[in-house]
Amino acid sequence: MKILVYGINYSPELTGIGKYTGEMVEWLAAQGHEVRVITAPPYYPQWQVGENYSAWRYKREEGAATVWRCPLYVPKQPSTLKRLLHLGSFAVSSFFPLMAQRRWKPDRIIGVVPTLFCAPGMRLLAKLSGARTVLHIQDYEVDAMLGLGLAGKGKGGKVAQLATAFERSGLHNVDNVSTISRSMMNKAIEKGVAAENVIFFPNWSEIARFQHVADADVDALRNQLDLPDNKKIILYSGNIGEKQGLENVIEAADRLRDEPLIFAIVGQGGGKARLEKMAQQRGLRNMQFFPLQSYDALPALLKMGDCHLVVQKRGAADAVLPSKLTNILAVGGNAVITAEAYTELGQLCETFPGIAVCVEPESVEALVAGIRQALLLPKHNTVAREYAERTLDKENVLRQFINDIRG
């Protein structure tokens, strides 16, 4: 098939949506599909355009797929308004490269959310070219915005009503909606999408990469990061933004400062400088910050953690399913997850006892108790690893998805 992938995040971004979209495109091309990509220059999670890329110029790249990079506004400190301008700027700049694909006549257009701002252009191209459309939802942008109080006066405000109407239009006017969890599938149905048009397309893990991590690689990375051998590692690896509520990790580290533990915060994001300042003001010698590590180092990094933190604010847990969790499960890590019992993560922990420790969000007491509980467990979590092997293998997930969208 001729497949056009349209979304703001793409390789070489190392985390989150860009990583998964890039791996999907490589897999599709390797299966013999003709793939084109319309995207932006890499900027996430640093919120800074990568070296050798420009935020202001178009760029065409040839490889496994033909890629068009489109200009966009990248705020250094993303606020709600700046984030909307950021997403909108990509929707505008990518419109003409998108329309240019009419002559190519793609068979399928896969639009990756965020950003919903791109949905109208995708639908127009589909109408002009005869393509079928798939809107793949990695993040319910509107729900996340409302759940985190970023839309002003809550769900009844004009901004919230406008955003909800725009989202409804995007969801109802595509051929299929795919998303990454069962609860997010149910949410699509609640928003009016016909159940037969909803596709389960979870984030995957390259299971084999995480099954046989050499102890020597773990020791080498530990030495490189200058982490002591006589202390257990409480690891957070990923985006450092507003959805996570990492202030509570600072509080937890403060309460556990006299125990033989190191809180290792690995990653980038708009909230990192503020967290570093908080830790410095409290004199937390048991907390260290590190830049995002390379993808090659990820298996050793995750195996190094004695306890993994998957932290989100209340209200965000069902709008966003953390992609980092797939690899934590694959490596057999013990995770402490902050999520309400009714959410996807809460249900996961209830359905598969022992897969992780689930605690109340935004509670320092619960987080500290969860960390203590996780540290008492065997270092290798067989429940987590077996779940990953059964349900998160990359080849199985992508093969099922392509079968689903063939129609």
UniProtKB/Swiss-Prot annotation:
InterPro entries hit by this protein: Colanic_acid_synth_WcaI, Glyco_trans_1, Glyco_trans_4-like_N, Glycosyltransferase_grp1
Protein name listed in UniProt: Putative colanic acid biosynthesis glycosyl transferase WcaI
NCBIfam families found in the cross-reference section: PRK10307.1, wcaI
A single MF term (Gene Ontology): alpha-(1->3)-fucosyltransferase activity
Pathway(s) where this gene product acts: Slime biogenesis; slime polysaccharide biosynthesis
Pfam family, one: Glyco_trans_4_4
GO terms for biological process, alphabetical: colanic acid biosynthetic process; lipopolysaccharide biosynthetic process; slime layer polysaccharide biosynthetic process
Claim: Nucleotidyltransferase is one of the keywords in the record: no
Keywords: Lipopolysaccharide biosynthesis, Transferase
SUPFAM superfamilies: UDP-Glycosyltransferase/glycogen phosphorylase
Organism per entry: Escherichia coli (strain K12)
